[in-house]
């Protein structure tokens, strides 16, 4: 039985992880990490700890859905107490991503901006479409609930990277995050990423390929956050058997 520690237990996905782990086979919840206290009751056999080392020692693998600053703390602690990590936290900055890569030299880490099977497949389709539809303009629109803090979403940026790599482009040089005023004509290499926020939308991503006379839109809609929690549990079961290294959700799903 693989023992899982949940980091970010008070968050939306963290709470779902705890519920979904109760129904999982060959994998169980052993510990949760909180900065102050847990917002809800939990099985007394599960360790609830504010001490990072105790939390890590009580589990075989960690699933993280927290905030970038908290994820950074986890990575720094895991370097000293290596554990396989499934990281679903989005909005990581360059320093935090470098820390993640450094940590993966000593432990297996699966990092994904979206844990769903559908988005993993969408990334592959976007890469293929981008390569095949040369001359088509690429625009990406993402929609999320009004409480989401980072924009654009990590998923949208991953999709943009897939589109850019399909054409051999450097996303940092062609990405557009917004348009306003008299900006002139659209550059043919532009990949625009737009973010909308409102209501309780779990997540919707649309990647459009637009040409004169026709267009194609690929989209994915998440209707429940259980998609992310179940995907993370599947990833944890897979990662527990792996050697040190940095893995993606596509590696796990063999897409």
Swiss-Prot record:
Q: What is its main location?
A: cytoplasm
Membrane-traversing stretches: none
Known catalytic reactions: (S)-2,3,4,5-tetrahydrodipicolinate + NAD(+) + H2O = (2S,4S)-4-hydroxy-2,3,4,5-tetrahydrodipicolinate + NADH + H(+); (S)-2,3,4,5-tetrahydrodipicolinate + NADP(+) + H2O = (2S,4S)-4-hydroxy-2,3,4,5-tetrahydrodipicolinate + NADPH + H(+)
Write out the catalytic residues in the record. Answer: 144, 148
Q: From what superkingdom does this record's organism come?
A: Bacteria
Any Gene Ontology biological process: diaminopimelate biosynthetic process
Where does this protein hold NAD(+)? Answer: 8-13, 88-90, 112-115
Task: List the PROSITE patterns.
Answer: DAPB (PS01298)
Q: Which HAMAP family match?
A: DapB
The UniProt entry, under PANTHER family, shows: 4-HYDROXY-TETRAHYDRODIPICOLINATE REDUCTASE 1, CHLOROPLASTIC-RELATED (PTHR20836:SF0), DIHYDRODIPICOLINATE REDUCTASE (PTHR20836)
Similarity comment text for this entry: Belongs to the DapB family.
The protein depicted here goes by the name 4-hydroxy-tetrahydrodipicolinate reductase
Species per Swiss-Prot/TrEMBL record: Sulfurimonas denitrificans (strain ATCC 33889 / DSM 1251) (Thiomicrospira denitrificans (strain ATCC 33889 / DSM 1251))
């Amino acid at each position: 039985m693989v023992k899982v520690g949940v980091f970010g237990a008070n968050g939306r996905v963290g709470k779902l992880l705890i519920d979904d782990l109760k129904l999982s086979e060959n994998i169980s919840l052993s510990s949760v990490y909180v900065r102050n206290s847990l917002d809800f009751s939990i099985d007394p056999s599960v360790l609830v700890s504010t001490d990072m080392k105790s939390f890590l020692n009580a589990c075989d693998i960690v699933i993280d859905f927290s905030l970038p600053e908290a994820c950074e703390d986890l990575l720094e602690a895991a370097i000293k107490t290596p554990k396989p990590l499934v990281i679903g936290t989005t909005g990581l900055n360059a320093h935090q991503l470098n820390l993640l890569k450094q940590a993966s030299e000593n432990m297996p880490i699966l990092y994904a901006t979206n844990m769903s099977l559908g988005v993993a497949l969408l990334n592959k389709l976007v890469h293929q479409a981008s390569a095949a539809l040369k001359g088509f303009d690429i625009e990406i629109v993402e929609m999320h609930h009004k409480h989401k803090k980072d924009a654009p979403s990590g998923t949208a940026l991953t999709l943009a990277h897939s589109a850019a790599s399909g054409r051999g482009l450097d996303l940092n040089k062609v990405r557009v995050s917004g348009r306003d005023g008299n900006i002139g004509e659209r550059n043919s290499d532009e990949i625009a990423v737009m973010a909308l926020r409102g209501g309780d939308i779990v997540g919707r991503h649309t990647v459009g390929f637009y040409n004169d006379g026709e267009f194609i839109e690929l989209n994915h809609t998440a209707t429940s956050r259980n998609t992310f929690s179940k995907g993370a549990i599947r990833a944890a079961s897979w990662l527990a058997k792996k050697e040190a290294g940095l893995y993606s959700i596509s590696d796990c799903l063999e897409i």
